[in-house]
Amino acid sequence: MSPPRDRVDAYYKDNFQFKNTRVVLNKEQLLIERPCMLLTVLFVMFLSLVGLLAIAGIRLHRAAVNTAKINNDLTTSIDITKSIEYQVKDVLTPLFKIIGDEVGLRTPQRFTDLTKFISDKIKFLNPDKEYDFRDINWCINPPERIKIDYDQYCAHTAAEDLITMLVNSSLTGTTVPRTSLVNLGRNCTGPTTTKGQFSNISLTLSGIYSGRGYNISSMITITGKGMYGSTYLVGKYNQRARRPSKVWHQDYRVFEVGIIRELGVGTPGFHMTNYLELPRQPELETCMLALGESKLAALCLADSPVALHYGRVGDDNKIRFVKLGVWASPADRDTLATLSAIDPTLDGLYITTHRGIIAAGTAIWAVPVTRTDDQVKMGKCRLEACRDRPPPFCNSTDWEPLEAGRIPAYGVLTIKLGLADEPKVDIISEFGPLITHDSGMDLYTSFDGTKYWLTTPPLQNSALGTVNTLVLEPSLKISPNILTLPIRSGGGDCYIPTYLSDRADDDVKLSSNLVILPSRDLQYVSATYDISRVEHAIVYHIYSTGRLSSYYYPFKLPIKGDPVSLQIECFPWDRKLWCHHFCSVVDSGTGEQVTHIGVVGIKITCNGK
């Protein structure tokens, strides 16, 4: 084996070498040529770099241009998509719905109406029974070639619809936001302060007559849902007469109806919009009112009991029926009404000043009546009520039925107010808590609308007023609610009003009617004429059965004397309770009868600790 050196220096046929060859380098030449080569290489590299940068810039520019173009295309596509969405959602969808309604609902209905019209016309031309030409459909589609005098009825119907629309628009703008449920002192857990505010600003005919010095008497005022109605007697005389022989005097019965609105002074005011003035007649002596559904209804008759006969009524018993819309129209009525006594047990009707309601096109009132079966059904109740320490009504001679030993029942009078309805008064009756005086009965609708509140006013220094419930369906029923006492030995349904002790308050000279307030819990107001102060006052008493609380506010009167009548009506307005009063007094100095009319606002605030 040869040594390594020999292996290194060995000759291989694949390595072409010249043995013993000597290479001589020219160092000077290398020193000159090397920088030039380096510069050339660097220049070439620089040019390559510039070229690469140029290529990159061109590509970047193209990419930016393409990106901008793509963004524009995307924006355009989005706009087109939104436009398509708008067309589908806001144009095509309602259009499809309209087409669907037309095809699926209206077209069949039109075919049905057309079929009905053809059928009605055939029936009209070939009637099998007497046709009612007062059908409102003939106002819309009158028959051809048939002469029918239907213009007046159609005009009345259109007038009532227009009045309803006007009333609703007026109440929406002026009264409805201000009227609400009464909830006086709801957050008070301790002492309270009651403050009052008086206002006599109004736009009523009674205000004009009072300003002229005319004598106003027997005023009744009722309110409801932003409306008011009233009736009264007024005596007019010629103020310009120079000689006493030329002075004339004429009495009238006046009916007013209107809305309650803000008159610019921060207090509610009555704004009369329609009225009726009739010369005083015997059948207009006593009137009872009902308000609702944009109209006022009244029944009036002579100041005497009405004798009822089964199936008919006497010719001498004239009942006047008046209907006024909040705005005057041809639908207003003033006519005589017939009394339908369909109950053979009814034999007497006793009407005083009563407040009714209007519901479902019908006016409703509650009044005392007498029945031939009173002793059979209520004789034991009266006997037990008068056994120990009999109340004053047991021996009363102030009211005809009590003096005759009769036991009055509750009668409900109804009259339909539709244009096609005849002015006929229907009567139904039923017994309930004993009726002990004839100071009137008032009806109010309860909060839930399932029943009515029936109130009787207090009897001066004798008995408290009562609040009963009245239900019409399925049959008439009157049940006690508050301020009545049960007579245990008198049977299951034997109740009498709460009578006061023998120690009467001599300072209380007169009591008013009892007013139910619109509230969830039963709240009511009554007033008394009080002479305990230097200035005589109307004292308002406010009761809340839900919280077992009561409040009072004395309103000082500018007049003084012996009271003749006191009538109030209350309604909520701007978080206050406002009560309208009509007070008639025989003046202590002159002996003449004077009146005071106005509205008192009552606000109850909590006293801070």
Swiss-Prot record:
Localization, UniProt: Virion membrane; Host membrane
Intravirion side: 1-34
Pfam families referenced in this protein's UniProt entry, alphabetically: HN
Coiled coil ranges: none
Intervals, Virion surface compartment: 59-609
Keyword match rRNA-binding: no
CDD domains per record: MV-h (cd15467)
Gene Ontology terms describing biological process: symbiont entry into host cell; virion attachment to host cell
GO cellular component: host cell membrane; membrane; viral envelope; virion membrane
InterPro entries: Hemagglutn/HN (IPR000665), MV-h_C (IPR049617), Sialidase_sf (IPR036278)
Keywords: Glycoprotein, Hemagglutinin, Host membrane, Host-virus interaction, Membrane, Signal-anchor, Transmembrane, Transmembrane helix, Viral attachment to host cell, Viral envelope protein, Virion, Virus entry into host cell
Descriptive protein name: Hemagglutinin glycoprotein
Lineage, top ranks: Viruses, Riboviria, Orthornavirae, Negarnaviricota, Haploviricotina
